[in-house]
Amino acid sequence: MAEHGESSEDRISEIDYEFLAELSARFGMNLVQLAKSQEEEDHKERMKMKKGFNSQMRSEAKRLKTFESYDTFRSWTPQEMAAAGFYHTGVKLGVQCFCCSLILFGNSLRKLPIERHKKLRPECEFLQGKDVGNIGKYDIRVKSPEKMLRGGKARYHEEEARLESFEDWPFYAHGTSPRVLSAAGFVFTGKRDTVQCFSCGGSLGNWEEGDDPWKEHAKWFPKCEFLQSKKSSEEIAQYIQGYEGFVHVTGEHFVKSWVRRELPMVSAYCNDSVFANEELRMDMFKDWPQESPVGVEALVRAGFFYTGKKDIVRCFSCGGCLEKWAEGDDPMEDHIKFFPECVFLQTLKSSAEVIPTLQSQYALPEATETTRESNHGDAAAVHSTVVDLGRSEAQWFQEARSLSEQLRDTYTKTSFCHMNLPEVCSSLGTDHLLSCDVSIISKHISQPVQGALTIPEVFSNLSSVMCVEGEAGSGKTTFLKRIAFLWASGCCPLLYRFQLVFYLSLSSITPDQGLDNIICTQLLGAGGCISEVCLSSSIQQLQHQVLFLLDDYSGLASLPQALHTLITKNYLFRTCLLIAVHTNRVRDIRPYLGTSLEIQEFPFYNTVFVLRKFFSHDIICVEKLIIYFSENKDLQGVYKTPLFVAAVCNDWNQNASAQDDFQDVTLFHSYMQYLSLKYKATAESLQATVSSCGQLALTGLFSSCFEFNSDDLAEAGVDEDVKLTTFLMSKFTAQRLRPVYRFLGPLFQEFLAAVRLTELLSSDRQEDQDLGLYYLRQIDSPLKAINSFNIFLYYVSSHSSSKAAPTVVSHLLQLVDEKESLENMSENEDYMKLHPQTFLWFQFVRGLWLVSPESFSSFVSEHLLRLALIFAYESNTVAECSPFILQFLRGRTLALRVLNLEYFWDHPESLLLLRSLKVSINGNKMSSYVDYSFKTYFENLQPPAINEEYTSAFEHVSEWRRNFAQDEEIIKNYENIWPRALPDISEGYWNLSPKPCKIPKLEVQVNNMGPADQALLQVLMEVFSASQSIEFHLFNSSGFLESIRPALELSKASVTKCSMSRLELSRAEQELLLTLPALQSLEVSETNQLPDQLFHNLHKFLGLKELCVRLDGKPDVLSVLPEEFLNLHHMEKLSIRTSTESDLSKLVKFIQNFPNLHVFHLKCDFLSNCESLMTALASCKKLREIEFSGQCFEAMTFVNILPNFVSLKILSLKGQQFADKETSEKFAQALGSLRNLEELLVPTGDGIHQVAKLIVRQCLQLPCLRVLAFHDILDDESVIEIGAATSGSFQKLENLDISMNHKITEEGYRNFFQALDNLPNLQMLNICRNIPGRIQVQATTVKALCHCVSRLPSLTRLGMLSWLLDEEDMKVINDVKERHPQSKRLTIFWKWIVPFSPVVLE
């Protein structure tokens, strides 16, 4: 290490790019690019952070404390990181070494933090084992005193002499002043930061900044004569009372401890491993191959335990594995050779010379062994012996000491340490759970304040009567056993103060048993014995040095008298008791508790810790699990307790496929299997409990209830006092008048509800079936099925029975047609709070519905079909469900990927029922959407002058573009991480050869693509060959058609439609298109070129029915169409848009030869031959849609033929000018004859303005009208006609557009708002104005608007640009929006995007 306080600033890389490339390939993600970007960001953060030796984080316990707010979804546990020298910085997820300042932001499943630390900073002095002041998490301040101070005791009576001893005081302890220490009577011993009182001999170490030497002296050695000479008894008492933890504990309790010190275990990094104990390591070699040439004893001494596979052994400390042992191999030498930095080896080496000395020092004191001075104030006072004890007292002392020895032997045996789990979890090793720190909070009985505690803090605060409460399987037993093991192993100095520790299971005792009998039976075994008198004497004499760990507490009434008294009258005995109790059993013991500890949910990093150790031979399956949960954050909480982890370990052991296809439902199945094995003797009782709890879960789920009271339980038939219930539900009583019950998790509630629903639907009782149908029918919309109840239905399918499945399938497949439910979709807020990720899913689905109802329908249909098929196949009822499935498929459009479903392999003929299949091919060629030109509208517009309170009505385009660019960048990054996948044609129908049936119609959507690669071409060739008809929709994909020429040439007779937008067609591509003989529809729009070769030869498409050309600003389109085009008599749609002058005579000839024309759109700027055009149109009796724009229109000529179009559904004359009143009146009268009209965009002009009221009245006679638009013609009188004429009229109106009507005054708007009513289907209302015509309105008008909006129940879009609204106005409008039936969908557009900032008036 450099000088203390300095650190290397070299750039470091935490990423294993070789492994990352492997991971990218495995999961189809480009993680390397993402990692490089993240690494650069981390480096910038690293450069900002403070470096240098951090003496405040020398303590491992303090480092551990910094992780309280750490993200639990990580691969490293806080214990591993703190032991490796790291503390949480609070900057993102960054951790930093207290010694070398190494900063890490990432975790690694394959590399532990200590390994990552060694790789990146091998020179770190902490790692090298040098004295940098590290304080182990279980270490204590009290140290064993030196036999003789340097220079003799007498010389240190003077403070200056004591001060001189601190000449080599270590750098890391400078936070504690040598002057203050010497003043408090301490002398530096020269070892680490250990000091010793010259008077009483008390020795203390582990000094940290802020420590008060006088306080420490008073706490640990209150009888010191020097201390008493300097401080009054009151001051000493205050010091002791204000000390945190260690109540009633002094230094004497630690120094006189009977616990053997396991010296090689001083390292903080390995003192949690139970395999630090040689006997436990030895026990793991029971199945060691007999033919192995290496002795088990040598392997054990070298720190190894057997993994159970081949001849592979693993070091308990460094985790290193060795195998393939040969004759003559020395395990210790090989350990040193391959893993020289192993902490166990280093500690073993450094302790080799010290062990004999310390072992004799720590030997149990005997009256005849003392050689110390008899001075009362000397060190001998601390090491007092039993020389003054009477004979009877000496007897209890010897028996107690012997008992302590027997207890320690018991707690370090495998039979004690191994988890007592039934056979479902029997393979879970001892080391995997005892090494995990549970998450604990402390709740002081007399105070509502709760606080998180680390395990060292718990151990420091053990006193009086305490309980540790938690769910069934939360780790209470493990926690108590861990305390007993750590005490017995000598690895935990914090527990040295206890001379006797009794772990007693209360589930196997009877009320008439004596305490001595219980201890003998449970802990001492055959031959073990302790007298009641001796036990009583030991408890009375040792008091606070006795710790009872009472497991499986169920109530005071069932306890033997001795234990009952210890709990209820602890003030008489002053022993320490820690009682493990289920959460719902705490109430009757609470009056006797000082502190209650509560075990929280099992952190996910503990799950990873266990699985990483248990499946170290197959780490890939653990990686898959982590990725699964990273993609499904809502499911991370399923590992609520260690018991769930044990269940999945068992499932993975028994079912290898579960490792590759992990699903949360298998976890719950494994957990229920565990319960069935645990309670197989009472199977009927278990079934009844699961059934009643399932009923409660089901009722709660459908009423959005996730908390229950006693009445709810009683109504569902749940017995809250039955122990089985505690494995399914939790009881919460803290700070509540009545207890509240919850299931082990929201997902577990859904799982039990699913079990119950299947039970009901499968029942032979009609009442049960009816109840099941009642619940099933509450899932009455597709959105509920694929969102709020998606997980629930998935769980139901995993239990599906042959009787229930057809009922569920029929119901699900009928939901897609529930249109009314779709229009009233709203999320379940209570459910969303529990499943925040589901809320994002809901937002996506709702957004899809708003943007593209057609895509939403296809998406929902596919999802429901997949779910229905899961039910059918899981229950083996495909034949019974097929009629429902076939009916569902008829006439429907679905995604191509559904053909991978097994059903289309089994029933390929069902393919013929579909209307079409869609496939999308998306590339990375971004089309810029931010280059729109604002010049057309804004170039001659002056910035508006407005009051400051209205400036929020305008947003500068640069800000808008900046936000859009950020979104675009996010999209690019996402696409780089997730490469575009090829259409999947690997399963189901695609495995049939030959294909018995073809896809009726294939719709191919290609977006932002360049030329296709060979892999995509191969896929398209196979898909095209399996299609009867193919339709192309290409957007921003120049060069794509040429690249798939081989596929098109093989299937050219199948291509019926080609729609192309924003792309350039090469000459080769135009020639390729001309070879498609079956083309019926051709669309070309928004291109920068005129594909003249294609257009010159349009007549070669003999089956062409639709031609759509939208090329604003390009050369005259009509001029390049061939004369032979008129021979295409089947034309049904002709849409021409060009902004140049056109010769309409050719167009007239075309129309005259198109008798089947249904749709006609025209935009151009030439007026000649208009009358002949209208005459030609009049002959088209089948026209359903007419749109005119540009300058090609003569009003009277068109009005004269308008009554001929009795089948007309859409008439768009937006922007056409009707100047005279006579023509306008005739137009209004003609409208009355268009009884089938659905959409009307009214023309403009003075004439139309004069007859606007008449037009409104005529529209009232149009029963099918859905869209109505008036621009620039309405005034106060005419607009009120619309409002006043709504009684019984406009019932189907969905879109009312009255924007840009600047003749309407504020009063006119107000009257209109007050009158508008009874439009039940109106979804869009547009009242926008242009910027010069902006309007500033009074509060009464805003109020009228709000009342109007509240009377339009289907409104989802309100446009009101140029309405100047202040903060108060928007508050009123937003309040109405929140209360509106469509509040989740209603969007209000009121803000202009402009290339200027408004002028603010003073």
Swiss-Prot record:
Transmembrane segments: none annotated. BIR repeats lie at residues 60-127, 159-227, 278-345. The keyword Lipoprotein does not apply. GO terms for biological process: apoptotic process; negative regulation of apoptotic process. One of its GO terms (molecular function) is cysteine-type endopeptidase inhibitor activity involved in apoptotic process. Keywords: Apoptosis, ATP-binding, Metal-binding, Nucleotide-binding, Repeat, Zinc. It comes from the Eukaryota. InterPro entries: BIR_rpt, LRR_dom_sf, NACHT_NTPase, Naip, Nlrc4-like_WHD, NLRC4_HD, P-loop_NTPase. SMART domains: BIR. CDD domains: BIR. Coiled coil: none annotated. Zn(2+) binds at residues 315, 318, 335, 342. It holds the Pfam family BIR. Residues 464-759 form the NACHT domain. ATP binds at residue 476. Prevents motor-neuron apoptosis induced by a variety of signals. This is Baculoviral IAP repeat-containing protein 1g. It comes from Mus musculus. The gene is Naip7.
